[in-house]
Amino acid sequence: MTSTPLPLVTREALKVFTQRLVENFAPQKVILFGSQARGDARWDSDADILVVMRFEGSSFEQRLLMLEVGAPSFPVDLLLCKPEAAAQRYGWGDPFIREALDHGEILHG
């Protein structure tokens, strides 16, 4: 008999990570999208999270800081966009932005 592994991403872990982001970065929106939001994630699936907020400097450096401070206990693919960039990318048909905004689960905002 084989046991099914526990999922890497849990509701409680998502809540803790989101709270850390909100407390430290004040994002306008935090949205879970992809397989975790659709409910068809496997036990080893990561969490795809879109964060919409204003920030200075490089989005790469900001994402690294957010991951360091947020210290997720699960694998995460963090997509960071300024509000105007998210709107522009949505208009261009960006599949990740559209998936997040049209079908994602709002964790904050």
Task: Set out the residue ranges of the language-model regions.
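Glycine-rich beta-strand-to-loop/alpha-helix junction loops that act as flexible
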Residues: 33-35
